[in-house]
Design a protein with these regions (language model features):
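Long, low-complexity intrinsically disordered regions
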Residues: 1-146
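Glycine/small-residue-rich phosphate/adenosyl-binding loop
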Residues: 196-277
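C-terminal helix-cap and adjacent tail motif
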Residues: 321-377
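N-terminal loops that bind phosphate or other acidic moieties
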Residues: 369-717
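N-terminal targeting/leader regions
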Residues: 131-172
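Small-aliphatic-rich amphipathic alpha-helix that forms the alpha element of a beta-alpha
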Residues: 182-187, 250, 258-309, 460-476, ...
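N-terminal amphipathic, basic-rich helices that act as targeting or association modules
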Residues: 43, 93, 101-103, 118, ...
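A glycine-rich helix N-cap at a beta->alpha junction
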Residues: 220-228, 240, 311-338, 512, ...
Length: 717
């Protein structure tokens, strides 16, 4: 017997239809009225409170108003902020939706008289050829119904209220029927190829739980040793498991051999077995929440060590170790969020339309990341700024005695919208690495491959920035945004390469506009990742042989200062090479004539990939109201570009130090920022920003811990 299979050609990726939306089949679909589109009123921009603030602080976003250009030793408090009218709430506009007709019945065609039969032997006369009649598509039935409002809300509620619980467990036993319902829910989870690769090992034995607790504690101690001091201090206060406090522990495993060699869906995706078991974990978790049971996922285990300790078959993989029990309460926020360890990322950060990077929530027009970020940047908060200056006057010290630190503490208050401001700890320095085509012009004595070698040095902990970061307790985050060489996958390296180095800007643009925007996006995404991970301060860092040449070109464009006055010696070049470096910058500016009013165009013409990424980091930090401590000349060049894109972004910037490079002095003057440290540093890597970090943290801590005259019972003068 021969079986002939005729397969209809289907699109590779068909989008699921929304309820009530017509879906085209193989035949022409019946036309259905589209929902009427009613424009929704755009919300008015939030009024920006403005108060008159005496030098050295103003409430506008530009730090030129926060940190005055003139050297001010004793800042004066601002005037009382004027109350602003509260805008009336806008009326909610609801779009009317035209409902889809339940069915469409085609009209019947009239019957036609039969044609006369031809006589025998006669040839039929040719007649007009009629077009084939179009057969209308049959009406389709309504889609399968969803849940009613109450049922849908119950499903969504259990998802919203699911929590990873580590505290507040009770010793109440779990009834067998309750545990059975939870396991049945887990067992109904979807699995690739219907392989159902999971097993559930239910542990009640106090002895076994004690053994697992010891294994977890050993891994916790090992992890703590890897953390920078700022993170280690936070981690010490966290409870990571409740193995001994819960009456039931459940181990969820995955069997990668279940279903045999030809399990559907695992031909090219062998990892689908543990992925499927993870779905069973989620089902279990949601069902447990519905039953009033708390669940805590413990991941501090060596997986093979756990398999042996529990006597599991060696071919099984452990997906989850869960602590299950009744709890006193379910917290409104995740415990890690409450502890300041991390923050929930907004949905808008992770939804892309058609292609990665075209961000849009359903119903929105796609927009780029830079546009979204700039729209979220706001000035310093006038109310918190005023409260900071008032508190400074009441603290047990002479007015102005802390100098620049008082200005910084007020800036931090205005940025965070609260006084006292959060202490900017933990902190992370983002070291963006990229190479430069202008290296071919002989502007440095260092070979280009040093960039990649230094990236490896950062990851190995052997660079100066690593030593300084260890001293101040900061994390070092290394991002390959444009290293010319291919870097091996290494723990701690973020591979975000836009292109392998820029082009030589003496012969053409350093990069395209699209590449520039992509590098800016890398910086914004890095800021988002680091802040969502719980960091409260961002520091700029960079690595790229020949990047001071690029910095000089950028600073010359944005300040208008001649390249001869701002181009320094970088890594210590001789007079001949320095003269060549100045000439290279001049030729590039003459070739491109970059317009400072188009900062993205300036970066594309004469910028670097790491400079563009630092621009993104500054903008990203400002949009998240997180302080950004700037390093040296390259960071100064990036800050000039960031200010040109969004002037209010400088409200988040703090000048960590003054570099020995003359271009950095010009940049700081243009930005109106006073540096905290002046040690003739010219290394980069974020080293100057790291040295300044404790000063920034001290400014905030003083606002928290220094008593006022009233609270301390100290008489004022």
């Amino acid at each position: 017997a021969v079986v002939v299979v005729v397969a209809a050609e289907l699109p590779e990726a068909a989008e699921a239809a929304e309820p009530g939306e017509p879906v085209e089949g193989p035949e022409a679909a019946v036309e259905v009225a589209e929902p009427a589109l009613v424009p929704v009123a755009e919300p008015e921009a939030e009024p920006v409170p403005v108060v008159a603030v005496e030098q050295p602080v103003a409430v506008e976003a530009a730090p030129a108003a926060v940190v005055a250009e003139a050297d001010v030793s004793v800042p004066q408090p601002p005037a009382e902020p004027a109350e602003q009218p509260v805008p009336e709430a806008e009326a909610e506009v609801v779009a009317e939706v035209v409902s889809e007709p339940e069915s469409v019945v085609p009209e019947q065609a009239p019957e036609q008289a039969p044609a006369p039969e031809p006589e025998p032997g006669a040839m039929p006369e040719p007649g007009p050829v009629s077009e084939p009649e179009e057969i209308p598509a049959p009406a389709r039935s309504a889609p399968a119904p969803g849940y009613d409002d109450a049922e849908r809300e119950a499903v969504l509620r259990v998802m919203r209220e699911r929590r990873d619980i580590r505290n507040g467990f009770r010793g109440d036993p779990i009834p067998h029927e309750v545990l059975l319902r939870v396991l049945e829910a887990a067992h109904t989870a979807p699995s690739v190829g219907h392989s159902q690769p999971w097993d559930f090992v239910v542990i009640r034995s106090a002895e076994t739980r004690s053994t697992m607790h010891e294994l977890a504690q050993r891994q916790r101690d090992a992890y703590a040793k890897t953390l920078p001091k700022g993170r280690a201090k936070q981690f010490k206060e966290l409870k990571i498991e409740a193995i001994l406090e819960t009456p039931v522990n459940i181990v969820v495993t995955a069997d990668p051999t279940r279903g045999g060699r030809h399990t559907l869906g695992r031909h090219t995706q062998p990892q689908m077995a543990p992925y499927s078991s993870a779905l069973a974990v989620e089902n279990l978790w949601l069902a447990a929440r519905a039953e009033g049971l708390g669940v805590g996922w413990v991941s501090f285990f060596d997986e093979r060590e756990m398999v042996r300790a529990l006597g599991l078959p060696e071919h099984l993989e452990v997906v989850a170790y869960l602590c299950v029990g009744y709890v006193d309460e379910f917290p409104e926020e995740p415990e890690l969020t409450q502890a300041g360890w991390s923050k929930r990322r907004p949905l808008s950060w992770v939804v892309h339309e058609e292609t990665y990077g075209r961000r849009a929530l359903p119903g929105e027009e796609p927009h780029d990341l830079l546009q979204e970020t700039v729209a979220n940047i706001r000035p310093l908060d006038a109310k918190a700024l005023g409260e900071a200056w008032e508190r400074q006057k009441r603290m047990t010290k002479p007015a102005g005695a802390l100098g620049m630190l008082e200005i910084i503490s007020a800036q931090l208050s205005g940025l965070s919208r609260v006084c006292p401001p959060p202490i900017p700890e933990p902190a992370a320095v983002a070291v963006f690495a990229g190479d430069h085509g202008v290296h071919a012009q002989g502007v440095t004595a260092w070979p280009q491959e040093v960039t990649g070698q230094m990236v490896a040095n950062f990851l190995g902990g052997g660079a100066v920035c690593n030593a300084f970061a260890h001293q101040v307790g900061a994390e070092v985050c290394v991002i390959d945004v444009g290293v010319a060489s291919e870097l091996p996958a290494t723990p701690g390296l973020l591979p975000r390469k836009v292109r392998p180095g820029t082009a030589d800007f003496t012969t053409g643009p350093a990069m395209t506009r699209e590449e520039t925007l992509a590098a800016i996006d890398v910086g914004i995404e890095t800021a988002r990742d680091l802040v969502a991970a719980g960091n409260r301060a961002l520091l700029t860092g960079e690595m790229g042989i020949a990047n001071t040449t690029v910095s000089s070109a950028l600073i010359s464009v944005f300040t208008g200062v001649d390249p001869g006055e701002i181009t320094g010696r970088g890594t210590g070049i001789n007079d001949e090479m320095h003269a060549r470096k100045v000439d290279v910058v001049r030729r590039a500016l003459e070739l491109h004539a970059p317009d400072p009013a188009d900062p993205v165009g300036v970066l594309a013409a004469v910028g670097g990939l790491e400079h563009a990424a630092m621009v993104g980091l500054i903008l990203g930090g400002a949009s998240l109201r997180t302080p950004v401590v700037l390093d040296g000349v390259s960071a100064g060049a990036a800050a000039l570009a960031a200010r040109a894109i969004a002037p209010e972004s400088l409200a988040a910037c703090i000048a960590g130090h003054r570099s020995a490079e003359p271009g950095h002095v010009a940049a700081l003057n243009k930005l109106g920022l006073r540096p905290l440290v002046d040690l003739d540093l010219r290394l980069g890597e974020g080293t100057g920003a790291l040295l300044a970090l404790p000063l920034v943290q001290s400014a905030a801590r003083a606002m928290h811990e220094v008593a006022t005259f009233d609270s301390a019972g100290v008489t004022e003068k």
